[in-house]
Amino acid sequence: TTVTAWLISALGFKVDIAAFALPLLAFALPLFFSGKSSRKSIGEFVFGFAFLFMGLQSLKANAPDLGANPEMLAFVQNYTDMGFFSIILFLFIGAILTMIVQASAATMAITLIMCANGWIDYHLGVALVLGENIGTTVTANLAALTGNTQARRAALAHLVFNIFGVMWVLVLFYPFTNAVSWFVTHVMKVSDPAVAVSFKLAAFHTAFNISNTCLLYTSP
């Protein structure tokens, strides 16, 4: 999901990401059928990236256009100016949407598109991202129901990890998100608002996971 956010942010919404897929496939195919395991591993890695680019292009092409549906856009914007309640509401929306789609990369792409088009602001986009981090754990937990004890423990750890992260980020919501915003604006030097908001969400997702990992790793 983090890689998806950074790729879309770096390449933009107007670049045909799928155009990168064919050269990658041409490069990966001979390696994929190589007799050497090291070359085959490289081929599989590049092959996966090629399909990732194709999937990202499909997500971008099929994302809902709220601008063409003013009634839906007005409905969404009715719930964007209720203070911290809007943050909590969009967090639940992000979680439920990801549970339904069962692909956090897809909901991340939708979030980036909504923020880049100005349909929701950066802070509400962050709330959706937090919800997506919780919603994405449902797939793992459902799959673990038929697995062994280790699989169920791993799925539960994934859920606890993300819920713990969401809880402390909500406590420090504005300081944390504003710090990420400052980093993108002043360190990465991204000034275009439509582009900057995508980088801010990608940077937030990265900072969230790194910070959460460090907190849990250093806790007794």
Report residues per predicted region:
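Membrane-interfacial helical/loop segments at transmembrane boundaries in membrane proteins
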Residues: 67-82, 179-198
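Helix-loop-helix hairpins and the membrane-proximal interhelical loops
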Residues: 46-94
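Cytoplasmic-side transmembrane-helix entry/capping segments in multi-pass membrane proteins
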Residues: 18-22, 40-48
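Conserved small/polar residues in nucleotide/adenosyl-binding loops
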Residues: 217-220
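Membrane-interfacial helix-loop connectors
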Residues: 1-20, 98-135, 144-146, 182-193
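Structural signal for the N-terminal portions of transmembrane helices
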Residues: 46, 151-164, 188-215
